[in-house]
Amino acid sequence: MIKQRTLKNIIRATGVGLHSGEKVYLTLKPAPVDTGIVFCRADLDPVVQIPARAENVGETTMSTTLVNGDVKVDTVEHLLSAMAGLGIDNAYVELSASEVPIMDGSAGPFVFLIQSAGLEEQDAAKKFIRILREVTVEDGDKRATFVPFDGFKVSFEIDFDHPVFRDRTQSASVDFSSTSFVKEVSRARTFGFMSDIEYLRKHNLALGGSVENAIVVDSDGVLNEDGLRYEDEFVKHKILDAIGDLYLLGNSLIGEFKGFKSGHALNNQLLRKLIEQKDAWEVVTFEDASTAPISYMRPVAAV
């Protein structure tokens, strides 16, 4: 049986919020079967919990924000991408502020944290959402689509009219039955343009942004001294973001996501449309792991 997973141990980290610039303390904790991923604002009294679900998404400008009343948690997508990539079903994410720390701008540090905590299988079947028919949302020339696929695949195309992007791959398709999330996607960093930074800061966004936690692009090229981690790092980061946004379904997916210039807002619209159209998906479990179209790294002992 493919079983649900949580963390073996509690693990902590410190970082800054990309948009707030605030110092943030992050604690990842094990959670019982069928809890899902739950964000907890531990700085509030009483503590406010926000389940990582599509219906709890509020703001989608520059990042994905979860809300519960007037309480919010910003920039959840990179951590959720790491949770999805490692098959973590249940965990509590405690935060000392309103934003998940940006770390290095990728999901890599979160993967390291989760692997350091160790993974633990739980005594319940893992539930997957299987896509049964095509579902699409569009906004102008932007598009996001689910199609049936026997596995999990993410295809994405970006279209930036900028010399740095024109010289590099702007489309990628990753089939996770044959490609490692950890090796091929998790280290792709978020990116931004120098020309936008003044505007963003004026609107209290990207206050914590720097070449330490983002790829910064100007008219001549990439400003980061160490360059890119992957030749197609820009589009790979969009795939990383999409995986995090899709995990707001609350379960791992069996199907393919196709994005063309899609962002957090359109990704969330697609999830909401899918949830409404109950004939477009089903929940499945696998008593025999060998029959499943998806496999995960074996749980390893905490280091």
From Swiss-Prot:
UniProt-annotated catalytic positions = H264 (proton donor)
A biological process (GO) of this protein is: lipid A biosynthetic process
Taxonomically, which superkingdom?
Bacteria
Give the catalysed reaction(s), semicolon-separated.
Answer: a UDP-3-O-[(3R)-3-hydroxyacyl]-N-acetyl-alpha-D-glucosamine + H2O = a UDP-3-O-[(3R)-3-hydroxyacyl]-alpha-D-glucosamine + acetate
Pathway in which the depicted protein is active: Glycolipid biosynthesis; lipid IV(A) biosynthesis; lipid IV(A) from (3R)-3-hydroxytetradecanoyl-[acyl-carrier-protein] and UDP-N-acetyl-alpha-D-glucosamine: step 2/6
Where on this chain does Zn(2+) bind?
Answer: H78, H237, D241
GO MF term set: metal ion binding; UDP-3-O-acyl-N-acetylglucosamine deacetylase activity
| Record keyword Lipid biosynthesis present | yes
Q: Membrane-crossing residues?
A: none
Q: What is its EC number?
A: 3.5.1.108
Required co-factor(s) are: Zn(2+)
Record flagged with keyword Hydrolase: yes
Listed under GO cellular component are: membrane
For this chain, the annotated S-S bridges are none
Keywords, A to Z, come to: Hydrolase, Lipid A biosynthesis, Lipid biosynthesis, Lipid metabolism, Metal-binding, Zinc
Question: Member of which family?
Answer: Belongs to the LpxC family.
- Tell me, what does this protein do in biology? Catalyzes the hydrolysis of UDP-3-O-myristoyl-N-acetylglucosamine to form UDP-3-O-myristoylglucosamine and acetate, the committed step in lipid A biosynthesis.
Q: Give the matching HAMAP family.
A: LpxC
Instruction: State the protein's name.
Output: UDP-3-O-acyl-N-acetylglucosamine deacetylase
Query: What is the originating organism of this protein?
Result: Pseudomonas fluorescens (strain ATCC BAA-477 / NRRL B-23932 / Pf-5)
Cite the source lineage.
Answer: Bacteria, Pseudomonadati, Pseudomonadota, Gammaproteobacteria, Pseudomonadales
Q: Source gene?
A: lpxC
